Regions:
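Conserved functional loop/turn residues at catalytic and ligand-binding sites
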Residues: 12, 72-73, 80, 92, ...
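Alpha-to-beta junction loops
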Residues: 23-27, 51, 70-79, 92-95, ...
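C-terminal lobe and pocket-closing loops
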Residues: 84-152, 185
Length: 199
């Protein structure tokens, strides 16, 4: 999710784009460190939108980056919805767009997706999975997978996650492996394109 500092004279995604284009190299953006998901998501957005902002990494800490955004030390931050939601709801930061190309966030119905805002290429999501050691017997893996998918499909569980900005999807082990490979290749290509190096 793209969130902006309230110190900027913008209220919408389009206004942010126009302001950033009118001030090339004068704005900056926060991340939780070089190569982190917020950094890669921001670089993808800036590349697609053809914007020039300076990266300010806060080593491994979204909390530091959010504080800098609230203070006006940085102009924008690409952050997970669940992290940003309380600060948006409290009026500390401004939500401009959601990185999902699928749907808006239930708790923020007025915030467009990047696709709706005209940049469908900005498709970057944080995700979580449950894994077991590779030596785990197949029958145990199948049992765990079935039980977890049952929980994930429960409407009450789905609703509890949606309120917090999450979307839960079940899968098979093979589907998860294929998804992880695709995500790895996407991130690898972005890292190589940007010539990122982790210190």
């Amino acid at each position: 999710m793209l969130v902006a500092s309230l110190t900027l004279p913008v209220k919408t995604f389009a206004e942010f784009i126009a302001y950033a284009k009118a001030n090339p190299g004068k704005l900056n953006f926060a991340s939780a460190g070089v190569g982190t998901a917020p950094h890669l998501a921001a670089e993808l957005f800036l590349s697609v939108a053809q914007l020039n902002l300076t990266h300010v990494p806060y080593n491994g800490s979204s909390a530091q980056a959010i504080r800098a955004l609230i203070a006006g030390d940085v102009a924008m931050f690409m952050v997970g919805t669940s992290t940003a939601l309380p600060f948006i709801k409290n009026g500390n930061v401004r939500a401009l767009a959601v990185t999902s190309t699928i749907s808006r966030v239930d708790g923020l119905p007025d915030v467009p997706t990047f696709a709706e805002a005209g940049l469908p290429q900005v498709d970057y999501s944080l995700w979580f999975a449950i894994a077991v050691p590779s030596a785990t017997p197949t029958d145990i893996v199948k049992k765990l997978n079935a039980d977890i998918n049952k929980i994930v499909a429960d409407p009450q569980y789905q609703d509890a996650l949606k309120i917090r900005g999450f979307e839960a999807k079940g899968s098979t082990s093979d589907e998860l492996a294929a998804f992880m490979e695709k995500d790895y290749l996407k991130n690898r290509a972005l890292i190589l394109k940007l010539r990122l190096h982790v210190d």
